[in-house]
């Protein structure tokens, strides 16, 4: 049974990491660190359980059953189809894909626009940016088996280096002053961190990514089913380790900056303050590049996953046509109506996450018994 070399395993692990690590993953840890203060360690343990361990277990569970269809289908074929369709639509074109464009626009473009921009001009700029963003993402997503070449070998290393630069800059710039935890964290930091990690909803994304990661593993020459499952599991473990490191580093940034920024609403404000304090005007460029890369990686990964799944579900419609449909739909939503879609979809996502957790452990237990 052929296996990947250590170098290629790292590439696949980087690729999976990049598909998980979007804007939300950048925002939650710094806010947790700032609010948890002296209780950051137990809070981070809670967050890592739901934001890293559960998604990694979901990847393993899906890999052991050779796909979500087989895993969910072991309960009932109708459940497999309905649940998978809902996951791909909600984590894909209805929510996450359009949000990658709108979030990266807010962080990579808006800070450089003058205050005199009218609402109409800003909307036009947003549409132009989103159109360009999705054209590039669609071109990259045309070849899902080559994601490893761009995301794994280029984009993720750049992203990790830039995050490391910010981390080192903050550690050098700010004294180690840890303030007391906010009232919401005192006495139950672990539980609060658990809920924070739950909000990333990466366990749902984990069900999506297995097929595309398997394609990239097969492109390296591993064709055996057991071999692909083994390498997918290793990729899940590798991506999980990377996520733990990055989450811990960005949470520590929040801890160090908490005494300076005061009360904040989200982690974006903390990161923006940190890079500006450390790097001045260049900090805007740095944080803009980081958010663009993170959002672009997730966008491409989700476009590939959703298009591949629906092509498998409805073979008469080609992968390319599904890709165009999801790209155009996501472009429209990113320009207008995203908040309304989020208001409708987020309650549904919160219902689906417990089902995903139960399905993950069901798959692990079922496979062990077999």
What does each model-found stretch correspond to?
Residues 36-126, 131, 135:
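Membrane helical hairpin/interfacial module
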Residues 5-16, 41, 77-91, 125-131, ...:
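Select transmembrane alpha-helical segments in multipass membrane proteins
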Residues 241-270:
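Extracellular/periplasmic helix-exit of transmembrane alpha-helices
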Residues 32, 102-124, 218-222, 299-325:
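Helix-loop-helix connectors at the membrane interface of multi-pass transporters/channels
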Residues 141-170, 345-358, 370:
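Membrane-interface loop-to-helix entry segments
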Residues 238, 242, 296, 310-339:
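Loop-to-transmembrane helix boundary motifs in multi-pass membrane proteins
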